[in-house]
Amino acid sequence: MLDLKITKNILSKSTFEQITSDPILCTAPYLQSNSLIYLPVRMVPTVQKSSLTIFPEALLSSFSYTAYPFDFIGLYNREKYMQLGGFDYTITNPYWQNLDFSLRGWLWGEKICISSSIKLMYDEEIPLEDTTVDYMQLRFYLKNTAPIFINDHAYIPISRIFNYIHNASTNLFSAITDFKDARKWVEKNKYRFKMDMPHLVDNWERRRS
């Protein structure tokens, strides 16, 4: 995260109390560039050609849901953060790490919103997100996109191993190991899932303000 201007009165007492009393995973701020231009920080998940894509949109209302907080910036509910397991340190690309944690929250029934009551401005240039499709993206895929939700739990169909091996940049043994580990992780947490990625994307419109 780059330098931000933090002022003494950036958050009023009433706003802080409202945010801390609301059981939301993360409340993100409005963000401005150093030229006072508001950034399109509402991130909207969609599917294009069978692949998950995130589109940034301008904020049109005082309260909006977002797929993830841009640049990790937000007020996090500590208890919910811990329940989700925090950020996955094995995903070293910041973009995919942020997206992994945030969408895990959504898939497990949590919410992330943007509040107009909090506004921050960058002192320097706006950070660029590295959305390169690489090994880190594949780790994100296994934990978030590969699982299917049915009835009351999630699982990764064994049939998805073929597509994963085809796209993996690692050798066959490593790809199979990664896939097996991901299936074990989803099996361990299967009842924490409340939906899968297609359901989240399909129902996003009703969450948009």
What positions do the PLM features span?
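Short, flexible, basic/aromatic active-site loop/helix in glycosyltransferases
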Residues: 29-30, 44-67, 71
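Conserved donor NDP-sugar-binding/catalytic core segment of glycosyltransferases
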Residues: 5-46
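Acidic metal-phosphate-binding loop of nucleotide-sugar-dependent transferases
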Residues: 2-6, 91
